[in-house]
């Protein structure tokens, strides 16, 4: 008998753990508060929710949700002849909850599915973010549901920030800027952002692109200094510019190693000789 009771208790614990896990995985399928429709309008909304939202896929459910919310808003604005609102504050809140509790799980399942895809569009991301902001503004979501909805906003913001990092990698003009790119890449090189194939490729190449951008800028600066040696007014002024250019090369090599600066160094060395002769003759 004791063995049977023990087995039953263990089974109940397992079921309980599984239920909790399912709740957090599913996000919003089990709201803490169950709304029972009592007034005729609440029941009307409940019927619309059952037929138009529940069991439908995201596009249809999303349209239905917004239509139903619009209906609630319209009815809530109507006043009776005595000046009182046609719907009480309680009715409005209950109707919104009925619609929210049916729609939020569909939204969360869709957004998880969308962020698992390898290609995203700006229009869909903006729509998801706007939808998430709208749902949170209703102040109904809580727990896992709230976390899932809020995560949409964070994901979209991080996606845009990550692309900004990728773009800025092509305009790095200092060692500090390159190191900053490396740090930011590490920050954003994670799921679900890396599910997006284009962004993943951009992040993977950003550090290399940043170093290449800096090296190109250093080489261009060396060429400019070398080619304009006659414009400095004195050899000392030219020498200061040459040393600054060489210091940038040394800083790069010390920070990252490598770098193709042979031609730049040769150009500066030749310009140094030319500058000595030029300023000796003309000043």
What annotation goes with each model-predicted range?
Residues 1-13:
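N-terminal Sec-pathway targeting helices
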């Amino acid at each position: 008998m004791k063995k049977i009771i023990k087995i039953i208790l263990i089974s109940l614990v397992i079921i309980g753990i599984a239920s909790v896990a399912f709740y957090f995985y599913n996000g919003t399928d089990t709201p803490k508060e169950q709304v029972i429709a009592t007034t005729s309008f609440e029941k009307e909304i409940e019927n619309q929710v059952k037929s138009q939202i529940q069991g439908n896929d995201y596009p249809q459910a999303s349209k239905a949700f917004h239509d139903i919310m619009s209906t609630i808003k319209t009815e809530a604005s109507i006043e009776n002849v005595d000046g009182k609102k046609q719907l009480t504050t309680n009715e409005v809140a209950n109707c919104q909850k009925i619609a929210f509790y049916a729609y939020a799980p569909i939204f969360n399942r869709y957004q998880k599915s969308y962020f698992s895809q390898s290609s995203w569009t700006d229009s869909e991301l903006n729509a998801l973010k706007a939808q998430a902001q709208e749902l949170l503004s209703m102040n109904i979501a809580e727990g896992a549901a709230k976390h899932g909805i809020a995560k949409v906003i964070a994901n979209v913001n991080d996606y845009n920030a990550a692309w900004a990092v990728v773009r800025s990698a092509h305009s790095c003009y200092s060692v500090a800027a390159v190191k900053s790119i490396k740090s930011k890449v590490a920050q954003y090189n994670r799921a679900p952002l890396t599910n997006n194939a284009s962004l993943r490729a951009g992040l993977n190449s950003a550090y290399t692109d940043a170093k290449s951008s800096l090296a190109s800028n250093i080489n261009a600066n060396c060429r400019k200094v070398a080619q304009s040696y006659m414009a400095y007014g004195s050899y000392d002024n030219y020498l200061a510019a040459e040393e600054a250019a060489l210091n940038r090369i040394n800083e790069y090599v010390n920070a990252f190693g490598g770098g193709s600066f042979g031609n730049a160094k040769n150009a500066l060395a030749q310009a140094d000789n030319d500058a000595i002769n030029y300023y000796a003759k003309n000043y």
